[in-house]
């Protein structure tokens, strides 16, 4: 049983905490918050030991009537690994100023740059490379989703060139500061977007073969990808079969009512998923087509949750708890109640 500390109990951190708590080979020894908000109070109510991420703010929790066990410095030495859930760019600062100082292994999230850590993690592609490493970046929700679909395609044919258009949600449901509300925004307006190079940080053999562009649209539910991949040779049946065999990919049919991201989220609600999380990515089966060995398909990504099981697998890899990535994936999925 390994000790996991969650530094930053926010959108990602609280989900990772719940996922880790469901595993039988790891436990959450504490979570941190920078301010005494409702998430901090709920963390305590759920039984997590709460620590102030910033020592100077400990008194704010006490004044708000939220019990804290101490500060980050009081618990970090007990951790075998820290999962950093801090906002973008803060993770790198935490790595340099906290984790390396205390000699504790750490997982950064996708908001940090590839060069900030020793490697970039995806359960299917880079588990072996990250095995036993000290500081790893777990790639973003979009990159995680693309890595899964590229894995499926690569299992039946060589990828010669990949072109992906990402239609990104404007904000998470709880975000009142981000937009747009009434616009479609190229993000970035230049091509390629950062997503292609990010995929390459996980899958080096796609260097020079992947091109991505991205726009932001006024929705909060999910991202969507329109994928076009030139291959050495395949057919639709092979791709459908590969998607079905690849972990954490669901193939859903518009003919059965899955005709929008809203319906996919409704499905997740009906599954009884906490926070309506869909840790699996969803590929529309009708969108899968192969013309002259070029694969076309569309997939949806729940931006708040597809990286969560990857964090659990990354813990096992870095702490050398399981050498077989597929066994770790299976163990994580079973504990979290994933479909596949």
Swiss-Prot record:
Residue numbers binding D-glyceraldehyde 3-phosphate: 140-142, 195-196
Is Cytoplasm one of the keywords? Answer: yes
Q: What is its EC number?
A: 1.2.1.59
Q: Please tell me one Gene Ontology term that the record gives under cellular component.
A: cytoplasm
Q: Which Gene3D superfamilies match?
A: Dihydrodipicolinate Reductase, domain 2 (3.30.360.10), NAD(P)-binding Rossmann-like Domain (3.40.50.720)
What does the UniProt entry say about where the protein is found? Answer: Cytoplasm
Where, in this chain's numbering, is NAD(+) bound?
11-12, 111, 169, 303
Among InterPro entries, the record links this protein to:
DapB_N (IPR000846), GlycerAld/Erythrose_P_DH (IPR020831), GlycerAld_3-P_DH_AS (IPR020830), GlycerAld_3-P_DH_cat (IPR020829), GlycerAld_3-P_DH_NAD(P)-bd (IPR020828), Glyceraldehyde-3-P_DH_2_arc (IPR006436), NAD(P)-bd_dom_sf (IPR036291)
Q: In which pathway does it act?
A: Carbohydrate degradation; glycolysis; pyruvate from D-glyceraldehyde 3-phosphate: step 1/5
Can you supply a Gene Ontology BP term from the record?
glycolytic process
> So what does this thing catalyse?
D-glyceraldehyde 3-phosphate + phosphate + NADP(+) = (2R)-3-phospho-glyceroyl phosphate + NADPH + H(+); D-glyceraldehyde 3-phosphate + phosphate + NAD(+) = (2R)-3-phospho-glyceroyl phosphate + NADH + H(+)
Active site, UniProt feature: 141
Statement: the UniProt record of this protein carries the keyword NADP = yes
The family classification in the record reads: Belongs to the glyceraldehyde-3-phosphate dehydrogenase family.
Subunit description:
Homotetramer.
Name the NCBIfam families for this protein.
GAPDH-II_archae, PRK04207.1
**What is the designated name of this protein?**
Glyceraldehyde-3-phosphate dehydrogenase
Report the gene name: gap
């Amino acid at each position: 049983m390994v000790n996991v500390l969650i530094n930053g109990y926010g959108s990602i951190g609280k989900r990772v905490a719940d996922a880790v708590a469901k595993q039988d080979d790891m436990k959450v020894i504490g979570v941190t918050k920078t301010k005494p908000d409702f998430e901090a109070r709920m963390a305590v109510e759920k039984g997590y030991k709460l620590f102030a991420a910033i020592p100077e703010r400990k008194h704010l929790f006490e004044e708000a009537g939220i019990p804290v066990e101490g500060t980050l410095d009081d618990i970090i030495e007990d951790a075998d690994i820290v999962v950093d859930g801090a906002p973008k760019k803060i993770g790198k600062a935490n790595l340099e100023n906290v984790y390396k100082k205390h000699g504790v292994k750490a997982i950064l999230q996708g908001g940090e740059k590839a060069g900030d850590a020793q490697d970039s993690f995806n359960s299917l592609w880079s588990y072996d490379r990250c095995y036993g490493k000290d500081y790893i970046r777990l790639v973003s929700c979009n990159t995680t989703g693309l890595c899964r679909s590229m894995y499926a395609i690569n299992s039946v044919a060589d990828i010669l060139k990949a072109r992906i258009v990402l239609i990104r949600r404007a904000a998470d449901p709880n975000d009142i500061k981000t937009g747009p509300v009434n616009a479609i925004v190229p993000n970035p307006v230049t091509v390629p977007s950062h997503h292609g190079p990010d995929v390459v940080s996980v899958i080096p053999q796609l260097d020079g073969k992947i091109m991505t562009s991205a726009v932001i649209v006024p929705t909060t539910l999910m991202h969507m990808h329109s994928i076009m991949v030139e291959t050495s040779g395949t057919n639709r049946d092979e791709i459908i079969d590969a998607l079905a065999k690849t972990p954490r990919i669901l193939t859903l049919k518009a003919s059965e009512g899955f005709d929008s991201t809203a319906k996919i989220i409704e499905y997740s609600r009906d599954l009884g998923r906490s926070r309506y999380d869909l840790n699996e990515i969803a590929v529309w089966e009708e969108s899968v087509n192969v013309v002259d060995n070029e694969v076309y398909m569309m997939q949806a990504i729940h931006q708040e949750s597809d990286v969560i099981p990857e964090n659990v697998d990354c813990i096992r890899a870095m702490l050398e708890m399981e050498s077989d990535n597929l066994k770790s994936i299976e163990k994580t999925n079973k504990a979290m109640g994933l479909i596949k």
